[in-house]
Amino acid sequence: RAKLDGKRWHRQRAHFVIASMRRFAEEMRSAGFEVDLRRAPSLRAGFDAHVSEHRPDVVSATEPASWDGRALMERLGVELRRSDQFLCHYEDFAEWAGDRKRLTMEDFYRWQRRRLGYLMDGDEPVTGRWNYDDENREPPPGAEHPGWPEPPRSRLDDLDRQVLADLPDHCWGAEPDGTWATSRRGALARLRHFVEHVLPVFGPHEDAMTTRSWHLAHSVLSPYLNIGLLLPGEVCDAVQDAYDAGRVPIASAEGFIRQVIGWREYVWGVYWRWMPEYRSANELGADRPLPPVFTRDAGTTPVTEMRCVRTCLDGVHERAYAHHIQRLMVLGNLALLSGTDPWAMTD
């Protein structure tokens, strides 16, 4: 409960995490597992209550995704097991980094390709080229374009309604409307939809933005990867299979796999390599408060004449989501140019 009460969470984000957890507990019970899902003031309080009641010989858990989470698990004496939510463990990243003078994503990405075998012919890329980024910068098509297929939607049920009733009043943002799946089955359906209907045109338009579509040709799969409803290996396997079957051009397959095994895993590895000092790094000395444009009340419009910023923030309010170009090129760039304190942006 302390986690929920500690910040003003977006209503859809809080619902997504809690509903996914409760639905997973239901699925595990149906599969015959004994599940102890309890509400507690804090993770530590819930852990202590569980241990006091069940007296386990060993408590084991998948490695947390944060430095603080891992530190807490170690203090509690929890046996940690490697997470399968990343294909390159941070210890493997550290071994790759070694005493390199530079840690570039492209070098890491090529090492990952060779190690994992995606889009490879032996030790070389299948087409002789590692990177198709120069072909993946097309602007969005004009108004005559019929549009991109809408991602599947989920129907809210009693579990969803109970989660929403349990959320604190200070949550903000639009109510959940089925945009985000909260089950393994729903996440897999969205993966199949993306690979079949969207991936073929993902590459050329992966850096595009438009006011006519919030998702364009983006996968909209990152929430499921981040929470563990999908695993990076199965996502990349699906893309590899589609390429092998001739259903997806190389620029789209390579561009997507680069996002997953390249950028996503590179940033993950850098985080663990440089923590805990990384949390306080502020090389540019940015110390200004969050610009008012980033904050808004329900039903109001961000105060700005910059349509790109307004469109991105509308999407954050309506869906708790912004794709990678919106985060990097618009919202992140605005924070950089305005000298916003990194922690103010994070909170």
Task: Explain the meaning of each model-derived region.
Residues R38-P41, A61-P64, R81, I227, ...:
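Short His-Asn-centered micro-motif
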Residues R1-A40:
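N-terminal beta-strand-loop-alpha-helix module at the start
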Residues V220, L225, L230-D347:
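Active-site-proximal binding-pocket segments
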Residues L43-W180:
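Beta-rich, aromatic/charged-enriched effector core domains that present basic-aromatic interfaces
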Residues A2-K3, S66, A335-L336:
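Short, glycine-/Ser/Thr-/acidic-enriched flexible segments
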Residues D36-R38, S42-A49, W343-D347:
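Beta-rich nucleic-acid/ligand-interaction surfaces
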Residues L116-I257:
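Glycine/tryptophan-enriched, flexible segments
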Residues S20-R23, G46, C308:
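Well-ordered alpha-helical segments embedded in enzymatic catalytic cores
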